[in-house]
């Protein structure tokens, strides 16, 4: 996925109210931008961090600039949580998810379960329906190990419960973790920051929910899914 138009460099001053950040450019001009991420962004909000912004000419937007990339630990990290669903389609088209190939129809944002929407519903006359839930990942504490979540997510735990019900009905269900940074070789669930999600994840795997993780190459030109990474179900004291 290419950034069109190109991104603009800036420095982060602070992030606040989840959806906002104050930033400054080289000319020291300070202004407010939108932040397309509802999570904690743990480890990505250091003052004076190098960041990159997209510009949107839509006059209905309150803030014309939007945060897209943060530099952390000498690595570019994508923070826009609306992008992984676009990157999933690229990953499937590029052969990174052969387990999900062969489906003729891919439906987005379909209602299922009791009160949820699935990111993707894959359908084909010759294959069982596959319900695919996608999560954005950017958190790293140990070198090379990406983790999710970086804070408690009751909604995420509910999604795992819904996927287990799908499997019980004889259909396929899968979790796909899109890692918007390149400096990782493995992925794990962050049990210590969200024990409930960790327990639900363990149950989901035992119930037959499939799980995949893909890391992306991040640059100011674009974000591209490039490689599967192994999944290690570690605990925080492992």
Curated annotation (Swiss-Prot):
Molecular function terms, GO-annotated = DNA binding
Which Gene3D superfamilies does the protein's record reference? 2.40.50.580, 3.40.1350.60
Coiled-coil positions: none
Pfam family example for this protein?
SfsA_N
UniProt xrefs under NCBIfam families: sfsA
Q: Which HAMAP family match?
A: SfsA (MF_00095)
What PANTHER family would the database entry show? SUGAR FERMENTATION STIMULATION PROTEIN A (PTHR30545:SF2)
Family, according to the entry, reads as follows:
Belongs to the SfsA family.
The protein here is known as Sugar fermentation stimulation protein homolog
The top of its lineage is: Bacteria, Pseudomonadati, Pseudomonadota, Alphaproteobacteria, Hyphomicrobiales
């Amino acid at each position: 996925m290419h950034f069109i138009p190109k991104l603009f460099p800036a420095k982060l001053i602070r992030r606040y109210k989840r959806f906002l950040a104050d930033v400054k450019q080289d000319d020291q001009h300070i202004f407010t931008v939108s932040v397309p991420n509802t999570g904690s962004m743990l480890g990505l909000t250091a003052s004076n961090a190098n960041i990159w912004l997209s510009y949107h000419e839509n006059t209905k937007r309150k803030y014309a600039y939007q945060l897209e990339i943060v530099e952390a630990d000498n690595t570019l990290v994508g923070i826009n949580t609306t992008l992984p669903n676009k990157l999933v389609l690229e990953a499937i088209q590029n052969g990174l998810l052969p387990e999900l190939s062969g489906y003729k129809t891919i439906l987005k944002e379909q209602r299922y379960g009791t009160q949820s929407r699935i990111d993707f519903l894959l359908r084909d006359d010759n294959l069982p329906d596959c319900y695919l839930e996608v999560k954005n990942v950017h958190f790293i504490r140990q070198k090379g190990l990406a983790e999710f979540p970086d804070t408690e997510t009751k909604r995420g735990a509910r999604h795992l419960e819904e996927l287990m019900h799908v499997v019980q009905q004889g259909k396929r269900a899968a979790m796909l973790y899109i890692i918007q940074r390149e400096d990782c070789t493995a992925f794990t669930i962050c049990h210590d920051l969200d024990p409930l999600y960790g327990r639900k994840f363990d149950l989901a795997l035992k119930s037959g929910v499939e799980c995949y993780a893909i890391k992306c190459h991040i640059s100011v030109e674009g974000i591209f899914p490039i490689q599967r990474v192994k999944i290690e179900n570690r605990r925080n004291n492992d």
